[in-house]
Amino acid sequence: MTTDTLKDAPAVAVDFESFYGKDCDIKSLGQWNYLNNPNCDIYLMGVVGDGISWAGHPKDFDWSLLHGKFILAHNLSWDGLVLAKLARDGVIPSHVQFAGGGCTANLSVYLGAPRNLAGAARELLGVDVTKDLRTWMKGKTWQDAVEAGRADDLREYVLRDAQTCFNLWQKHAHEWPEHERELANLTMTAGWAGLRIDQKLAEHAAAALERVMWEARNDIPWADGDVAVLSIKALGEHCRANSIPPPPSTSEDDPACEAWENKYGAQFPWVAAMRNYRKANMLREKLRVMTERIRPTDGCMGYGMKYFGGHTGRWSGDARFNVQNLPKGEMFGADLRGCIVPRPGKQFIVCDLSQIEPRVLAWLCGDTQLLDQLLNGVPLYEAHARSTMGWTGGNLKKENPDLYALAKARVLGLGYGCGPAKFVEVARTMAGIAISQQVAARTVESFRSSNRKIIALWNRLQTDFRRSSGNAFVVELPSGRKLTYRDVSSSGGWTARVERGGRRIPFYGGKLCENLVQAVARDVFAESLLRLRRVGVDVVFHVHDEAVCEVAPGTDPHEIERIMSITPDWLHGCPLAAEAVVTTRYCK
C-alpha cells in the first residue's frame, strides 16, 4: 500500500489479529517470513472510522467501504504488509485504492509517549488498554478461542484497539508535522523494500565462523562436556580454579572485559578462545538471521528500523537485525557489511555528513573562530588545533599526525563533559591513540580552558534545567522541533523523564548539551534524506549520519555530496560537508 499523505481523506483505523506462538512471531522470523508462514492465520480484523465499526474475518468485510480512505494502524509497518498481502491474495478487490496511511505508534513516539498501544493510550488519551487477551491467545487459534467461549471477547478487543488507534489520530495528528510523517513513512517503506543479500558470500562467511568456533571450542576446557560453551558459571569456576578473578562482564563492548582479556589472555589460552568463540558466535547469529530472512521472491531481506527510536529523534535498530550496528570490516573471514549489495543494475553511493555533531556544537555555542576556518576550507580537526592547541604549521594531518589524532580525540570526545578516566577509552576507540590517565587529565583541563563557549553552553543548559524543577524543561531546536524533559526533580540527584510516564534519567549540563547537538544533527540529516528522496535518490537504509543510496551506474557521487551538504535555512552560518564513496558492496 502507498503511505503518501493525502490531506482531507477520511481516516479509518484497522487492526489485525493473527496466530502467534513459539518460533512463530515477528521477532523470531521477521515480518515477511512470519506473514508467509503457513501457521500465520490472519483470523480477525477490526475497522473503526466515522460511521464504520466492524469486526470479523477479512474475507467477510466489504472492502469498498475503505476505497479512498486514509488507513490508520498502530503499527503500520506490520498492518501495511498485511493489507498488501490481502490485496495480492484477492481478498481486497483491485478497484479498492487507499488514499494513504498513517502510523499512530510513530505519532506517539514523536509526542514523547510510549510506542506500544497501551502506553500511548495511557499517556495521550488517559485510558487504560489491557493486552491480556492477546497474551492469552499465544499458541491458540481462532477455533480455540471459539471453543473457549472467547470469540466475542476477541471481537470487542480488536474493535477497542482500532478505536484507540482512531482516537489517537483524531486527537493528536495535528501535532505531527508533515515532514516528520514523511520521514516515518520513508523509514517504513525502506524496510519493506529491504536489502539485497549476497547469499553465497554470507554462507561462506558463516562456514568460516563455524571453523573459528570449532577451533576455539577445542581450547575451552569445559566445552567437551554438557556445559554450554558460554556458561558464565563454568567460566567463573575455571577462573577460581586458576586463581584469577572472573571478568567483570563478558560484553565485548565493555572496556573492563577487554582489559581482563588482555591481562590474562597470554597466560591462559582459553581466555582468548572464549573471546574468539563469543565474537564469532555473535557474527554467526547475525548472518543466520540475515540468510533466513532472504525473500525467495527477490533475494532481498526486509528489515526493521525505528523512526524516533530515541529522545533526540534519532533512528534506532529493530527486529533482531540492527542495520545501524553492523561490525566494520572483516573479522574471522566474515564481512557482514559486504554481504549487503545493490540490486542488479545498481550501485551504492554511501555518503555521510562529515563531523556533523562537532560542527553543530560550534554553531550552537557561537564559536565563530572555528566556523570561519571551516567556511574557508580548513579541515575540522586542524581548525580545532589552530584555534585551541597552538598549531600554526601547514597541513596538520601530514605534518603532525600525532597532534592530529589528539585533536580528533578532543573534538569527538570532550564536547559533552567527558572526564579523564573515560577520555582514555574515548581516545583509543575514536582516534586510535593510547594515552595515560595523567595525559588525559591534562588534555581535559586544556580543552575546557580553551573552549569556554562550550562550557558556557553546558552551564546555561544546566541552569535552565534546574530552574525548571517541578515542571518540564523544554528546549526549542533551531528547526522548530522541541526537546522536552518532563517532571524535572532534584530529589536524589537531578533527573527528568524523557518519555511520558517513563523512568527517571539523570541529567547534567554536558549530557543536555549532547542531547541538543544530537537532536539538531538529526534534523539536519533528516532534511538531507528528504532532499534525496525528492530528486529520486533511493536511500535503502541509513546509519546515524550516513545514507546508503542505491543508484544507477554513472550517478555522480559529488551530486549526492552537494545535496547532503546543503545547510538548512534554520542553521544559517554552519558550514556542512559530506563525503561519498561509490561501491558495489556496503563497506563504510
Predicted regions and their residues:
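A common structural junction motif
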Residues: 431-433, 562-572
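Conserved catalytic core of nucleic-acid polymerases
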Residues: 245, 390-535, 575, 579-588
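Active-site-proximal helix-loop-helix substrate-binding element of RNase H-like nuclease domains
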Residues: 37-47, 51-58, 63-174, 184, ...
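Short active-site loop/helix that positions an aromatic residue
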Residues: 77-92, 108-111, 237-241, 354-368, ...
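Short, conserved charged micro-motifs
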Residues: 554-560
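Active-site palm subdomain of RNA-directed nucleic acid polymerases
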Residues: 172-183, 524-547
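Short hydrophobic/aromatic beta-strand micro-patches
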Residues: 548-552
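Conserved "right-hand" nucleotidyltransferase catalytic core of DNA-directed polymerases
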Residues: 1-30, 37-40, 44-47, 112, ...
